[in-house]
Amino acid sequence: LDLSFLLILPLWALYIGRNLPHYFALLGLPQDPRLLQGPYPFLLGLLAATGLFLSVLLHEVGHALAARRYGVATRRITLWLLGGVAQMERIPREPMKELVIALAGPLVSLLLFLLFRALPWEAGALGFLGRYLALVNLGLALFNLLPALPLDGGRVYRALLALRKP
């Protein structure tokens, strides 16, 4: 864990907690006044922020597992202020392997989106966490698929170009 991660987690938790009414509205949930008082906003914010960073970690683990399948070791996974990175020993020379490794992280995020979206939690703290983490994982997948390096989408684009190269 990078020091910036340890600094941002409580700040993100506080931000989410202070804006819970807006999040409930955004997620289409009825507001529960009990969750907006006392320690509950910060605790919900802390759970949501922790879920966000665990989602980023699982996204990066997806890359690491796909890389290992192709014999590419992952030196480390680092979580920091702006997300995470799986540092691999090398980039595979075969474009198809790079493509699979690049798509593995967004695929994990999409699977997490589907999992959280499928949960039967309709309201309250669990409803908030389920819908928040569904939205976060969908956003994580879509953002990472933007075709710009160093994002996964940039690596996908590079691999696709290499596959088309004569």
Protein language model annotation of sequence segments:
Residues 1-166:
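Hydrophobic transmembrane alpha-helices and their immediate loop junctions
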